[in-house]
């Protein structure tokens, strides 16, 4: 019985929510291991939509859900999201939700700094959600973060806040912002402490005990591997590691506990925010994909950029995340196109390459090299077996497998969880 890591294989928004929900019904424990409340997803269960951005998807199914130490937690958003779920009839208690005691907190100063940087008229715009994710990770690495466990120790909380503000107030002075008083941050923290502390735990211990007891653990990744701080399109990336290896570091469970890595892969490509996008389509096909695929961000509402499937970046992610198989999503969006293109390589300064360069300049200069396949006029929407798929659709899927070097384990043909074709069970050893 394998544990499963779910990772986005592109730039996020691949449809992880539906796949995670499908898998979470069979899992015993669901773990968030990186990111914050900057990447959202929607679950549709019995006609009811649940929009989550911080809490693990397993909560809506009553499964033990864990926020690992690799996540940055906005305590006020945490409380709001818990209350929203309760308002939809979901029972959220410490019996089903645990938060790592060593998870860093996002504070108001992080959100303000994030917004100020992104709104600046000078410098490089990354396209953040302005929710304080990046600045919170900066403080974690700088060893000045306030962590969840600090809320239990008033005697050490004040000096930690003082140290934090010594850094932030120097930044604020340089940006022409008013300095923040220690009491302001202390009040911000103490006002919410009683609502988050009942959920804290030694998550590494809880997960290890569950693993030894034979529980099936599902690691729920946020965003996509091409937004990874090391392996993504730097600097147009997020502030955490999003590749599958982070599941171990961000949960406290050793890497040998990771069994199967499932890469969620959209049948075309999208990206939100700034950064290179070799196969982007600024034409009627791009508009078609965006409109039919409802390509708008769950958290920000921002319109996503759309383009053809890029086998180069997915093949690279298969390697950097150790992907065993992919879940191919939104196949139905391609229905009706006369022809479909797949990027199989890039041209860089007159040379053919089979990888995405690390250099920002080179990433901007690469040109896609396409193969063109015939499309299909039949519908794939709602298909639940290979026999339901048009012959040309099957050829498209098989060609993707060949190009990326990984098999398709699951196929999604609509937002409904039942419209899923299972090829390989990720939980099966």
From Swiss-Prot:
GTP binds at residues 12-18, 40-42, 304, 330-332, 412-414. Mg(2+) binds at residues 13, 40. It catalyses: IMP + L-aspartate + GTP = N(6)-(1,2-dicarboxyethyl)-AMP + GDP + phosphate + 2 H(+). It is found in: Cytoplasm. Keywords: Cytoplasm, GTP-binding, Ligase, Magnesium, Metal-binding, Nucleotide-binding, Purine biosynthesis. Binds 1 Mg(2+) ion per subunit. GO terms for biological process: 'de novo' AMP biosynthetic process; IMP metabolic process. GO terms for molecular function: adenylosuccinate synthase activity; GTP binding; magnesium ion binding. IMP binds at residues 13-16, 38-41, 129, 143, 223, 238, 302. InterPro entries: Adenylosuccin_syn_GTP-bd, Adenylosuccin_syn_Lys_AS, Adenylosuccinate_synth_dom1, Adenylosuccinate_synth_dom2, Adenylosuccinate_synth_dom3, Adenylosuccinate_synthetase, P-loop_NTPase. Its cofactor is Mg(2+). Pathway: Purine metabolism; AMP biosynthesis via de novo pathway; AMP from IMP: step 1/2. The active site is at 13 (proton acceptor), 41 (proton donor). It is an enzyme of class 6 (ligase). SUPFAM superfamilies: P-loop containing nucleoside triphosphate hydrolases. Its EC number is 6.3.4.4. The keyword Transcription regulation does not apply. One of its GO terms (cellular component) is cytoplasm. Its main location: cytoplasm. Homodimer. Belongs to the adenylosuccinate synthetase family. Plays an important role in the de novo pathway of purine nucleotide biosynthesis. Catalyzes the first committed step in the biosynthesis of AMP from IMP. This is Adenylosuccinate synthetase. The gene is purA.
